[in-house]
Amino acid sequence: MKEGPISSSSNFNHIPVMGKEIIRSLKELPSELTKKGLIIDATIGGGGHSAQILENFPGIKIIGLDQDPMAIKAASKKLIKFGTRIEIISTNFADFSHHEQAICVLADLGVSSHQLDEPSRGFSFRLNGPIDMRMNPKEGSSAAELIETLSEQNLADLIYELGEEKRSRRIARKIKNDLAENGPYSGTQDLSYAIAGCFPPKQRYGRIHPSTRTFQALRIAVNNELGSLESLLLKAPNWLLENGLFMVMSFHSLEDRRVKSSFKTDNRLKVLSKKPIRASPEEIELNPRSKSAKLRISAKKFLT
């Protein structure tokens, strides 16, 4: 499938979710850590969280990671004023290895506002574009290729397991029948229309769009998001100094359950937020995306 044009990096100027809560947590660290410590921003995106941290802590340095070329471009432009205090690396956090210990590892999971708002990326069912959904448009198979190659059974299982969609069998059957009879879908809205047709009319206009869970499942599969998260949860504690913070922000239950379980069972970590931190009503009003966010924080234990 041909890729659509990639938009300007300026669209990454979104509001970082729960920025105040992250800064507040960092300020609770011992001052000797925040005076000259290193932070690993595992999902730098447009650089919003990193910019806030660098502005609030003049002695801190950040290594920022991202696999999206447009995010790298946007973050580099936004953070250039911080000079050598910021280093940006083009990589998936699952592939990152590091030896210098950090005072914090921060991960803001999932798809960004920019990626949702840019039709050419193919993440949105509201804006028509190619059925792509790759975080890195230059690597791996697109969502269109995925639905083409999977069997109906495997597609149904994927939609059920990664999207928690109860109508997964009906949706998979519809998609595979359409592909067999009419060839590839013309774009994301064409696919979304087919998915919506698997729901009773009264359920097509509810609070949650009929395509939400299926699009989520395809995006997670295309980018191996849960596999990458499992890798991060395993490796990140080794990057931390004693008392260093591991902060993970998730936007759906599949991610949050894994983060919660890992923090609870990992003997390298002490859970600091027994319940997830949620965005304030004021933030949700300004930034509706923050409503589904859950921030969990743990600290590196001293291991003898």
Curated annotation (Swiss-Prot):
It is found in: Cytoplasm. Its main location: cytoplasm. Pfam families: Methyltransf_5 (PF01795). GO terms for biological process: rRNA base methylation. This is Ribosomal RNA small subunit methyltransferase H. It catalyses: cytidine(1402) in 16S rRNA + S-adenosyl-L-methionine = N(4)-methylcytidine(1402) in 16S rRNA + S-adenosyl-L-homocysteine + H(+). Keywords: Cytoplasm, Methyltransferase, rRNA processing, S-adenosyl-L-methionine, Transferase. GO terms for molecular function: rRNA (cytosine-N4-)-methyltransferase activity. Coiled coil: none annotated. The keyword Cytoplasm applies. Its EC number is 2.1.1.199. It comes from the Bacteria. Gene3D superfamilies: Putative methyltransferase TM0872, insert domain, Vaccinia Virus protein VP39. GO terms for cellular component: cytoplasm. CDD domains: AdoMet_MTases. S-adenosyl-L-methionine binds at G47, G48, H49, D66, F93, D108, Q115. Transmembrane segments: none annotated.
